[in-house]
Swiss-Prot record:
It comes from Mus musculus. GO terms for molecular function: protein phosphatase 2A binding. Residues 360-371, 514-528, 589-620 have a biased composition (Polar residues). It is found in: Cell projection, Lamellipodium; Cytoplasm, Cytoskeleton, Stress fiber. The modification Phosphothreonine is found at T569, T589. This is CTTNBP2 N-terminal-like protein. The lineage of its organism: Eukaryota, Metazoa, Chordata, Craniata, Vertebrata. Residues 401-430, 467-477 have a biased composition (Low complexity).
């Protein structure tokens, strides 16, 4: 038994043996203790029967008496205890022998059973051995027959081999002849190959020379291609900038026309109001003729003009019109209303109500006729409503000065100077166009018309240049969203420079337009995206008139409820990372102008007329988006 590698049953047997040894040791210890106890008791109390209690009491009495008498008798051995020990030992030996006999009987039975099993196995093995010998005899007979058959086959194969060997000898002689012929042909082919190799070397030298020439030509072609791409990108960028500037100018002009139209309507309404006031004043004067006249002093004060920024892409009017209150005050007192009520006009998101300003002027004129008490005009009244995102013109005769802490002041309040003021205050207008437009205002309208003709020619040339490709894209798109249009008829490798220029234009446009969700548009789209002529004609007006001086404005293409402007760029999914936003031009920031009264002159009127001619090639669209007035410029086809 290997003690280092023990199996589970071996370990169990060892543990059982150890357990038996421990139990035997405990039994021996108990037996030894019992033997010593019995000997001690027998030696001391051997003459008494321990099972009888009376005898035990007598024994104890005698021991006590002996102690008292101090007389000790010698202890003698008792033969009864010895006999009991011998009997006990015999009983133990008998039990042990009986257990050994039972174990021997069980072992004998097991051996008998094993012998019987071995006898049966031997009988089976002998029977199987007879069967195996019979099968082996049959197999031997079969193999002998097969051996005879194979011998006959070997004889046949030997005969065939002799025939084949003779044939192989003949074939070998033929192959020798053929090999000699092939050697001769190979020598000839090697000589020809050497000649062809020399020719190939010469041709390779020529090919290398041609490749060097071709590489030089390719480098020159690549340089020319890069130059062409750069020039094309610059031209496209300039064209896009010119288009953007023209659209912005057209939007400003459209905004100013709407404002002048609103002012005219309000002037008519205020004329009616003045007539009513004059009638009320005449009635009051006739009633006061019988009274004693009172001399009243009249004080007037001049106010510097208000100069605010005239451009904001998103503008809304938040004005509380109090015509009824003004009329009641004027009819009750015979005097104009307080300056605070007349001057408190709202200015929010770059648009203010011109009706309140005109009402203020007319009520001031009526107060001078009625010899009312002097009232000083406070500059604080102009600060009652905050100015947000730039300013807009609100008055035509008496401009009011805005506080110096307002965001921007770059245009006068006269509508005759709206073109130049919108140019100077626009954050995206070109300084070159600004100088030209201001110069035309000082010189003559003919220069402005020639500039407009140049812009229109450039715009239509760029448009007709890409019309064919836009028509193909239109046929492919159908009623779905228009795909990305390549605005340059060049190869596909020019897409990098074109994409850079278009992304720059897109970044500029994204500053000044509200991007709405792009919806599928009609198939009759223009080369620059959606055909906005249909949108401008079919868009329904927004009913919110409290934010705009003209209630008839159409829905904005930039609003969330209408399709967005399709800029000449590729889709956002194909665009990749957007390019960095280019820095603003130094001439785009609005400049602070002097707060001096500006009157309407002939040169400014001519510049306004020229600006109207300039924007004649684009369709305006004044929109209302999210409660804010937005006026955008839409390209039209000529």
């Amino acid at each position: 038994m290997n003690l280092e590698k023990l199996s589970k049953p071996e370990l169990l047997t060892l543990f059982s043996i150890l357990e038996g040894e421990l139990e035997a040791r405990d039994l021996v210890i108990e037996a030894l203790k019992a033997q010593h106890r019995d000997t001690f008791i027998e030696e001391r109390y051997g003459k008494y029967n321990i099972s009888d209690p009376l005898m035990a009491l007598q024994r104890d009495f005698e021991t006590l008496k002996e102690k008292n008498d101090s007389e000790k008798q010698p202890v003698c051995t008792n033969p009864l205890s010895v006999l009991k020990a011998v009997m006990k030992q015999c009983k133990n030996m008998q039990e042990r022998m009986l257990s050994q006999l039972a174990a021997a009987e069980s072992r004998h039975r097991k051996v008998i059973l094993d012998l019987e099993e071995e006898r049966q196995r031997h009988a089976q093995d002998t029977a199987e051995g007879d069967d195996v010998t019979y099968m082996l005899e049959k197999e031997r007979e079969r193999l002998t027959q097969q051996l005879e058959f194979e011998k006959s086959q070997v004889k046949k194969f030997e005969k065939e081999q002799k025939k084949l060997s003779s044939q192989l000898e003949e074939e070998r002689t033929r192959h020798k002849q053929l090999s000699s012929m092939l050697v001769l042909e190979c020598r000839k082919a090697t000589s020809k190959a050497a000649e062809e190799g020399q020719k190939a070397g010469e041709l390779s030298l020529k090919l290398d020379k041609e490749k060097s020439r071709a590489s030089k030509l390719e480098e020159e072609l690549a340089a020319e291609r890069k130059r062409g791409l750069q020039t094309e990108a610059q031209v496209e960028k300039q064209l896009s900038e010119f288009d953007i500037e023209r659209e912005q100018l057209r939007a400003k002009l459209n905004r100013e026309e709407n404002r002048t139209r609103a002012l005219k309507e309000e002037v008519e309404s205020l004329k009616k109001l003045v007539k009513d006031l004059e009638a009320a004043q005449q009635h009051r004067s006739t009633s006061e003729q019988g009274r004693e006249p009172v001399t009243m002093s009249r004080g007037t004060a001049t106010e510097p003009p208000m100069r605010v920024s005239a451009f904001c892409q998103t503008e809304s009017v938040q004005t509380e019109r109090s015509h009824g209150s003004v009329i009641t005050k004027l009819t009750d007192t015979g005097l104009p209303g307080p300056t605070t009520a007349a001057y408190s006009y709202a200015k929010a998101n770059g648009h203010c109500d011109p009706e309140i300003q005109t009402t203020r002027e007319l009520t001031s004129d009526s107060s001078t006729e009625n010899q009312g008490p002097p009232r000083e005009k406070s500059a604080v009244a102009a600060q009652e409503k905050p100015v947000e995102n730039g300013g807009c013109p609100v008055g035509t005769e008496t401009p009011v000065t805005m506080p110096s802490h307002l965001p921007s002041s770059g245009s006068s309040l006269s509508p005759s100077s709206t073109a130049s003021s919108s140019l100077t205050s626009s954050p995206c207008s070109s300084p070159v166009l600004t100088k030209r437009l201001l110069g035309s205002a000082a010189s003559s309208p003919g220069y402005q018309s020639s500039y407009q003709v140049g812009i229109n020619q450039r715009f239509h040339a760029a448009r007709h240049k890409f019309q064919s490709q836009a028509d193909q894209d239109q046929q492919a798109s159908g009623l779905q969203s228009p795909p990305s249009r390549d605005l340059s008829p060049t190869l596909l490798d020019n897409s990098a420079a074109k994409q850079l220029a278009r992304n720059t234009v897109t970044q500029v446009l994204s500053r000044f337009t509200n991007q709405g969700p792009i919806k599928p548009v009609s198939p009759n789209s223009s080369p620059f995206g959606t055909d906005y002529r249909n949108l401008a004609s079919t868009a329904s007006p927004r009913g919110d008139t409290s934010h705009s001086p003209t209630p008839g404005k159409v829905s904005s293409p930039l609003s969330p409820l209408s399709p967005g402007i399709k800029s000449p760029t590729i889709p956002r999914a194909e665009r990749g990372n957007p390019p960095p936003i280019p820095p603003k031009k130094p001439g785009l920031t609005p400049s602070q102008s002097a707060t001096t009264p500006v009157t309407k002159t002939h040169s400014q009127a001519s510049s306004l007329a020229a600006t109207e001619d300039l924007a004649s090639s684009c369709s305006p669209s004044a929109v209302v988006a999210n409660g804010k007035d937005v006026e955008i410029l839409l390209p039209t086809s000529s």
